[in-house]
Amino acid sequence: MHITKPHAAMFSSPGMGHVLPVIELAKRLSANHGFHVTVFVLETDAASVQSKLLNSTGVDIVNLPSPDISGLVDPNAHVVTKIGVIMREAVPTLRSKIVAMHQNPTALIIDLFGTDALCLAAELNMLTYVFIASNARYLGVSIYYPTLDEVIKEEHTVQRKPLTIPGCEPVRFEDIMDAYLVPDEPVYHDLVRHCLAYPKADGILVNTWEEMEPKSLKSLQDPKLLGRVARVPVYPVGPLCRPIQSSTTDHPVFDWLNKQPNESVLYISFGSGGSLTAQQLTELAWGLEESQQRFIWVVRPPVDGSSCSDYFSAKGGVTKDNTPEYLPEGFVTRTCDRGFMIPSWAPQAEILAHQAVGGFLTHCGWSSTLESVLCGVPMIAWPLFAEQNMNAALLSDELGISVRVDDPKEAISRSKIEAMVRKVMAEDEGEEMRRKVKKLRDTAEMSLSIHGGGSAHESLCRVTKECQRFLECVGDLGRGA
């Protein structure tokens, strides 16, 4: 039987930060482009993934057992190294699952750490695509940095000169990902290995849109600029992020938000994997209090070490007014008329969408950034790790929709925090940022438009046509045999 409906198999790295954008892409391919989609996820993420797909047809979830890597990698290895080993060890099981299907998928879509699965394409006769859930700036640096000669690398890493990238804004030394600054460490070689594999696919999908990153996308698509390194089509398919869920608005924070004036509340969250030291938490609390602005703070215990962690254990008790011990004594009492504290987790997208929210102090993870833009909310950029410094530079220097901390690796004083908060929430500069981000929000909505020929929709239409042509060729070969 000749198969006419394209079938995409998607292979996601572990962790919901990786899985959720993959799920949103799967839903888009199924609902708007006629794909049947099979998403392969590790068992640790399976339950959460199923809950995100309750109302989605045309998308199947296949669980893969989580490989035991305890004897394969140092327990203290970088998270990039650990994820890469997990994905590599899962490839044989992925292959078995695909081979067991009645018909091989038309295309295999991997994310940034799934490059070991590219070898399956030739064997099983599939197209392959790399999905970068981050942005075009990240993609550009990722594919360009490994091609640099040692002299240029030394100018950047030793002499701390900005990294010049064809057709793009230069990247400051302070903004480059830490992994690129340690060429003798395993994490550097692991990251470079993945990045060098991206151009081996048939195309690269990136979670951005033309108006968000015009220079980087133009360079990636120009064969005289970064396109000569990418070597394959680069498709902007964003913004892809979790949709707002009306069912989550029964959280008590919304009762409080409903009583606040429009655009008067600053939302503060460093994401599920970000943390501050005890000293920095104290300075942040004092800065918020002295700013005299309304706020919602998703506050977690301090971690005096790396700013990157997956989980946080409860630490310390509370004082008599329920102020956590790691915050200034009496903080909750003194700010109770204008502040709302949330431990651990909050319905972020729904909070940002509320009319009372007028600013977002964020770690600049790409998903959080997209949620803020889609809600028309300007930001205070406080990056912590990975590509977040580059994201912060994009938001503040290129787009003008955020203010930015001077150096997130140094302690930020309460006076600087107060000034940033007031700038976004109470001064003319904040109003200008708000105007710009709302305009950018409108372009994001246009990008997603099905009937208006939005750039994201058109990009996926091109991918769909490529898959359909491939299906026709496979069918012709089958009939010829």
UniProtKB/Swiss-Prot annotation:
It is an enzyme of class 2 (transferase). SUPFAM superfamilies: UDP-Glycosyltransferase/glycogen phosphorylase. Pfam families: UDPGT. An anthocyanidin binds at residues 18, 386. It comes from the Eukaryota. Keywords: Glycosyltransferase, Transferase. UDP-alpha-D-glucose binds at residues 346, 348, 363, 366, 368, 371, 387-388. It catalyses: (E)-4-coumarate + UDP-alpha-D-glucose = 4-O-(beta-D-glucosyl)-trans-4-coumarate + UDP + H(+); (E)-sinapyl alcohol + UDP-alpha-D-glucose = 4-O-(beta-D-glucosyl)-trans-4-sinapoyl alcohol + UDP + H(+); (E)-coniferol + UDP-alpha-D-glucose = 4-O-(beta-D-glucosyl)-(E)-coniferol + UDP + H(+); (E)-sinapate + UDP-alpha-D-glucose = 4-O-(beta-D-glucosyl)-trans-sinapate + UDP + H(+). The active site is at residues 18, 111. Expressed in seedlings and roots, and at lower levels in flowers and siliques. GO terms for molecular function: coniferyl-alcohol glucosyltransferase activity; hydroxycinnamate 4-beta-glucosyltransferase activity. Gene3D superfamilies: Glycogen Phosphorylase B. InterPro entries: UDP_glucos_trans, UDP_glycos_trans_CS. Its EC number is 2.4.1.111, 2.4.1.126. Belongs to the UDP-glycosyltransferase family. Involved in the O-glucosylation of monolignols (alcohol monomers of lignin). Glucosylates coniferyl alcohol to form coniferyl alcohol 4-O-glucoside. Glucosylates sinapyl alcohol to form sinapyl alcohol 4-O-glucoside. Possesses low activity with sinapate as substrate. This is UDP-glycosyltransferase 72E3. It comes from Arabidopsis thaliana. The lineage of its organism: Eukaryota, Viridiplantae, Streptophyta, Embryophyta, Tracheophyta. The gene is UGT72E3.
